[in-house]
Curated annotation (Swiss-Prot):
A single MF term (Gene Ontology): cysteine-type peptidase activity
Residues the UniProt record annotates as site (Cleavage): T214, Y215
Superkingdom of source: Bacteria
Enzyme category, top tier: hydrolase
EC number(s) reported in the record: 3.4.22.48
Functional description taken from the UniProt entry: Cysteine protease that plays an important role in the inhibition of host innate immune response. Cleaves host elastins found in connective tissues, pulmonary surfactant protein A in the lungs, and the chemokine receptor CXCR2 on leukocytes. Proteolytic cleavage of surfactant protein A impairs bacterial phagocytosis by neutrophils while CXCR2 degradation blocks neutrophil activation and chemotaxis. Additionally, promotes vascular leakage by activating the plasma kallikerin/kinin system, resulting in hypotension.
Gene assigned in the entry: sspP
Family: Belongs to the peptidase C47 family.
Extent of the signal sequence: 1-25
Protein name, UniProt field: Staphopain A
Subunit structure: In the cytoplasm, prematurely activated/folded ScpA forms a stable non-covalent complex with ScpB.
Source organism (scientific name): Staphylococcus aureus (strain MRSA252)
């Protein structure tokens, strides 16, 4: 027995070492067997710069917790799935890195979008910006145990499955030009299959982290009663949606609607002239005055402290943005609403924004005046109208 004892120890060590990775993988994922059917997204290259990956891993939980508190969600645990990329119809990446945020059921709750900074970005602490929103999370959850490619054009975002069927899963209200309508088509066969690598976006890449402490300690301030009651379609009424949302919140009512606001201000327009009309800052201020408010124009982005004070005092803020990519077209200018603000665990200050195109909110660095939006464009926050 004594002579065999060392052999038994060696065998037990070999056995324990051989099963350790599997055991750790199971404990790290913490997902039931029925939920282990992963969504696989085709990518040309799975590589992600180290500083991009580190930024996502370091900050995602604080960003997610700020949105959880805005949505009045309960405390939860999250981890990141494998990052993926989105491609344009010419098969070139849109330039962003997308990190899915997984809950313990194996579903995607949020998307962390990390983008290279654009020229007009006012902050300078990093080469990248980080924003968190729901974005494509709901759509991706519908493709468990499937291999897909995500493509984008001026109409929105498409999921292309292995049988080469494409579905528009997220529309953007931006109008494409007539030439684009004639020439753009859904890539098939050879186009899609050239993306050889696969990102398992619902597969946990690290242990789940509870946001219990972050939830209790993190400061979040929301404009009371702010709700998403309607979203912008194929029209130029972003300012109408923005003012309606802010006034519904500050008056705690449901009576304001974008179309009615636009009709009030442009009663003589009909057809496409009415559908694609927009508003000037002067018209936005005038409408606020007719509703018992005293809106003020500020020719810059509001600071974090200004947002904090105005939001606490139930005064809504409209964002006026100018598109960085192009000054032409209906959406060259765009209005959005400030929902609130938060201070993350690392001390970073963020502003919570609602884009009328979206069904959810997004985070924005309070020192960054360039806002990435859900159609891939960027808007420079050049002015604010506060006091709705």
């Amino acid at each position: 027995m004594k002579r065999n004892f060392p052999k038994l120890i060696a065998l037990s060590l070999i056995f324990s070492l051989s099963i350790t990775p599997i055991a750790n993988a199971e404990s790290n994922s913490n997902i039931k067997a029925k939920d282990k059917r992963h969504v696989q997204v085709n990518v040309e290259d799975k590589s992600v710069p180290t500083d991009v990956r580190n930024l996502a891993q370091k900050d995602y939980l604080s960003y997610v917790t700020s949105l959880d508190k805005i949505y009045n969600k309960e405390k939860a645990s999250y981890t990141l799935g494998e990052p993926f990329k989105i491609y344009k119809f010419n098969k070139k990446s849109d330039g962003n890195y997308y990190f899915p945020v997984l809950n313990t059921e194996g579903n995607i709750d949020y998307i962390v979008t990390i983008s290279p900074k654009v020229t007009k970005d006012s902050s300078s602490s990093s080469k990248y910006t980080i924003n968190v929103s729901s974005f494509l999370s709901k759509a991706l959850n519908e493709y468990k145990d499937q291999q897909i490619t995500i493509l984008t054009n001026s109409k929105g975002y498409y999921v292309v499955t292995q049988n080469h069927k494409a579905k528009l899963v997220l529309k953007t209200p931006r109008l494409e030009d007539k030439k684009a309508k004639k020439t753009e088509s859904i890539p098939t066969g050879n186009n899609v299959t050239q993306l050889k690598q696969k990102a398992s976006v619902t597969m946990p890449t690290s242990q789940f982290k509870s946001n219990n402490y972050t939830y209790n300690e993190q400061y979040v301030n929301k404009l009371e009663n702010f709700k998403i009651r309607e979203t912008q379609g194929n029209n130029g009424w972003c300012a109408g949606y923005t003012m309606s949302a802010l006034l519904n919140a500050t008056y705690n009512t449901n009576k304001y609607h974008a179309e009615a606001v636009m009709r009030f201000l442009h009663p003589n327009l009909q057809g496409q002239q009415f559908q694609f009309t927009g508003l000037t800052p002067r018209e936005m201020i005038y409408f606020g005055q007719t509703q018992g408010r005293s809106p003020q124009l500020l020719n810059r982005m509001t600071t974090y402290n200004e947002v904090d004070n105005l939001t606490k005092n139930n005064k809504g803020i409209a964002i006026l943005g100018s598109r960085v990519e192009s000054r032409n077209g209906m959406h060259a200018g765009h209005a959005m609403a400030v929902v609130g603000n938060a201070k993350l665990n690392n001390g970073q200050e963020v502003i919570i924004i609602w884009n009328p195109w979206d069904n959810g909110f997004m985070t924005q660095d309070a020192k960054n005046n360039v806002i990435p939006v859900s159609n891939g464009d960027h808007y420079q926050w050049y002015s604010s109208i506060y006091g709705y």
